Amino acid sequence: MLISHFASNGPKRELKTGCLYKPLIPNFPLVDDFFVVEGKGPETIALLQITRAKEHHTKRTTVREFRDYMGKVFEDWERIEEGYGWEIIYIQHVDSTAIKKRQNCSTSGGAANDTDLALWDRIHQYQVTLSADIASEFINRSSDAREA
């Protein structure tokens, strides 16, 4: 799998399978990395969030920031957003308290943007726990991968 770093200051690019997309900006909204999966159904964007917390709820504004940023980076983002399946995988260290419930998307004051909340509601959520050895191997292999 290729590692593809991205930022919003370049030309828009095509979203492809076979790449692990890693944002170049610190504190990227919503996720740490993501990749696209091809299968029998619609293509799926698998979002990866590494966390030690037993909960990792988000806010509508964070979903909005993510959507806006992705629209600046990838060609045809509105079609992708509507047509692709969505998953988020919470990756946790074995010593963390496992996330066991669906993580919420909250609104603060004012009217919520239905598009942001609708996207969050479409995202299937999963949790995986990695032992220290597996986590280290995963990190090492990611570092050795070619850049796109």
Residue ranges: model-predicted function:
Residues 1-148:
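Charge-enriched interaction surfaces
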